[in-house]
């Protein structure tokens, strides 16, 4: 259950340490930021920003990669219900190819913060790169296993992206997007070799660019970024 007194408080309390440090420094509305989809060969990079009520514990919330799909889906709903604000930003395949994956990730993170229904006073960011915004912030290596806010953002980003890839699987059959979500699985690489890249493949990525025709005839139309506020 959620609340201030979980059955096993050690892990959730540890995950509030970074938020507690920011609160003691006088910052409020602390947003955790994380992304999903930096490594895949296809599809967008998705970032999420989550502001939780101070002191809220969410037992079970951890790095999304350590959770089952069923658990992520369950916690996705819990986070939306308990959070003060949730924002999502999307950098599509075309943006990734145009400005590189790091810059597309930072752009998606910035969009996620802008999509929040309230302005955060402090950002806790998974990774080592600051977001180009005039908001006090701190980067945290492996932050999705150290901060409840970042872990919550990790789950929102992962579930959002996975759902998008399931939709792409129906739109572009034969690649198996619903199963591997665009990552470089052997079955995915084999499909690219057989079918060639489809419109959502990242054409600057190894594993894809080797199979491009000399004059690509792929439609990269569509918005490069997206803002979604919950």
Curated annotation (Swiss-Prot):
It comes from the Bacteria. Coiled coil: none annotated. Pfam families: RNase_HII (PF01351). It is found in: Cytoplasm. It catalyses: Endonucleolytic cleavage to 5'-phosphomonoester. Residues 28-217 form the RNase H type-2 domain. One of its GO terms (molecular function) is RNA binding. GO terms for cellular component: cytoplasm; ribonuclease H2 complex. A divalent metal cation binds at residues 34-35, 126. Its EC number is 3.1.26.4. It is an enzyme of class 3 (hydrolase). Residues 211-230 are annotated as: Disordered. Its main location: cytoplasm. Keywords: Cytoplasm, Endonuclease, Hydrolase, Manganese, Metal-binding, Nuclease. GO terms for biological process: DNA replication, removal of RNA primer; mismatch repair. Its cofactor is Mn(2+); Mg(2+). Manganese or magnesium. Binds 1 divalent metal ion per monomer in the absence of substrate. May bind a second metal ion after substrate binding. PANTHER family: RIBONUCLEASE H2 SUBUNIT A (PTHR10954), RIBONUCLEASE HII (PTHR10954:SF18). HAMAP family: RNase_HII_B. Belongs to the RNase HII family. Endonuclease that specifically degrades the RNA of RNA-DNA hybrids. This is Ribonuclease HII. It comes from Geobacter sp. (strain M21). The lineage of its organism: Bacteria, Pseudomonadati, Thermodesulfobacteriota, Desulfuromonadia, Geobacterales.
């Amino acid at each position: 259950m959620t609340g201030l007194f979980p059955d096993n408080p050690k892990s959730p309390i540890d995950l509030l340490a970074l938020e507690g440090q920011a609160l003691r420094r006088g910052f409020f509305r602390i947003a955790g930021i994380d992304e999903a989809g930096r490594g895949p060969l296809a599809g967008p990079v998705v970032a999420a920003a989550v502001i939780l009520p101070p002191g809220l514990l969410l037992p079970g919330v951890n790095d999304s990669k350590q959770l089952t799909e069923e658990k992520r889906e369950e916690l996705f709903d819990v986070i939306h219900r308990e959070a003060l604000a949730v924002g999502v930003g999307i950098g599509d395949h075309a943006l990734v190819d145009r400005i590189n994956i790091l810059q597309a990730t930072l752009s998606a993170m910035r969009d996620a913060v802008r999509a929040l229904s309230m302005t955060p006073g402090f950002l806790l960011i998974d990774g080592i790169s600051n977001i180009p915004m005039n908001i006090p912030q701190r980067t945290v290596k492996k932050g999705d296993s150290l901060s409840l806010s970042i872990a919550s953002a990790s789950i929102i980003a992962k579930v959002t992206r996975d759902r998008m890839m399931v939709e792409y699987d129906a739109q572009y059959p034969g690649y198996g997007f619903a199963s591997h979500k665009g990552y470089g699985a052997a079955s995915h690489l084999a499909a690219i070799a057989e079918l060639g890249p489809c419109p959502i493949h990242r054409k600057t990525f190894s594993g894809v660019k080797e199979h491009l025709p000399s004059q690509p005839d792929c439609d990269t139309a569509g918005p490069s970024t997206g803002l979604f506020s919950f």
